[in-house]
Amino acid sequence: MTKVDLAGFDNSWYKPGPRWKILLWYVVNGVFIQSRHPFSGLRLFWLKWFGATIHGSVVIRPGVRVKYPWKLKIYGPVWIGEDVWIDNLDSVSIAAHCCISQGAMLLCGNHDYKSAKFELLTGPIVLEEGVWIGAKSVVCLNTICRSHSILSVGSIASGEMKAYTIYKGNPAIPLRNREIHNG
């Protein structure tokens, strides 16, 4: 039976950006983005400076981590809670009126468990308008959360979440329809 050989791992094909930009981002990210200071505007300034597309009102709470801002698009109003991890090895697009709650993770990378060399896999994540990602939830690569869908606390989503549907569990399964009332 074949075994995993991590010594053979090679992701040299993966080019997320210029090396200088990545290194400079790691410093700025550690000092200004992940820090516990309360200034969302400062986080937005640096994310935009490094190439994030950000429109409208966006609130980014303390402790948020973003792997590569130049692969991030946010169309506010959007709320991103404390300690959210956007591990965007691929593109992440967040539409208006989305809420990503505390400790949630958006993971655009994984590994091919069938490969002896444990090859890197990447894929995009799309959050359409009005999506709510619950606290401590995980959204995996190649996932589309359709309009106004909800991923409940601690759940894991991959694939497609249908519009106006609440999902729960690991793997996340449809629980019920989301009904929104005026007022």
Predicted regions and their residues:
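Flexible, glycine/small-residue-enriched loop-and-beta-strand segment within the central core
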Residues: S35-L44, P62-Y75, W79-C145, N170-P171, ...
